[in-house]
């Protein structure tokens, strides 16, 4: 049995007191229509073969949900949705795709309104893209960390583009980490599903002992944040840099039946999971914070909107419940689109010409040292992973802030760095990392995904964090 109120309650519980109840109810209430829109557009969801079932599609259950309510496309729902919609976009006569451009900033008029975006092409030339409305859907900030669950993660550049125009950034300190990502520093990210532990997988430390048994009565089946903190603690006290996820005891037949994708992928990386334990680490997985928006995706900057992981709608609070993020993307994107269509074009007047707003001039013949930029990025990721990840402390956050400021100064001292696309994006990434540290420093408690050894308990009242580009400027001016 399930209903909307049950889904709402599960979401509020997962958000640990910080959810916006209006955003939660809005998302859940509008969810069925959004799902039906996907079905109407041809997303191949897995059918339910039980003739007595109440719904024609198979529903599964994930962490935090107290009922089977998640529609899916086998074990690759996200890809099925994206592939279907990308094909629709390619066929649409009124949509122009510019895959040759990398957007690095937004255009703003004298009244402070957003008037489009600018980016560079493969020849490093700037292009202005003017628009009556601009919608950011640039992903989260998992790329701030050394280990992520996505092969090509964004690092919050879109969030900083919005902040540069004056948008508020909310709840940046709440970064979700998945407990088990394949540990392979030289290879692409690969998520090891929680189903592996659900089917009986054991987490082992450096000496081959199960460490979850002594920490939680649910052992490997404890909540995601509990398991991630336990793994992080083991890594900190060992020399491996990872722990082991062992399913050899399940037997080859069961492994082949339940985990064919994981079996094949690990084999391609030289690991036979029927004979070897899998090296795993917690990895940055989802950003609960982002650009603050209302129920239509609007930011506090006129004509600028944000959708998905780029945004912070208040739905997730201090911790995202599994699969709510994809639902959020759909519901808020539809709400945003319907709002813009309802407004019509008359009230916005003539669209600005591309000559009215220009990107910043690029320094002549600026050639950035790629090795130096790469080193700065790697140092940033190491610092964030060491001090601003699963377990935090006041001393660690202070150390992170000092190091990130030094990295930012190093980048700014490179001739032409801030007028070249690659330098501009790295600058945005470092700025967002600093803002994330500031948000974490402001939270004198442990709540949801933010766990502090100095503040292990919750404050009686949950308050969302909110920062702007001015807060960043003030922080950078200190100790200069």
PLM features per residue range, with description:
Residues 37, 43-67, 109, 204-220, ...:
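Glycine- and aromatic-enriched mobile tails/lids
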Residues 19-29, 69-87, 98, 148-156, ...:
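Short beta-strand to alpha-helix junction loop
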Residues 260-305:
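FAD/FMN-dependent oxidoreductases across multiple families
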Residues 1-27:
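Glycine-rich active-site loop/strand segments that organize a redox cofactor
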Residues 39-125, 130, 137, 146, ...:
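Conserved redox-cofactor binding core of oxidoreductases
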Residues 131-133, 137-142, 310:
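Glycine-/small-residue-rich beta->alpha transition segments that form the dinucleotide
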Residues 18-23, 35-55, 168-171, 241, ...:
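A short alpha-helix-loop-beta-strand transition element characteristic
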Residues 161, 167-278, 339-345:
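An anion/pyrophosphate-binding glycine-rich loop and adjacent beta-alpha core
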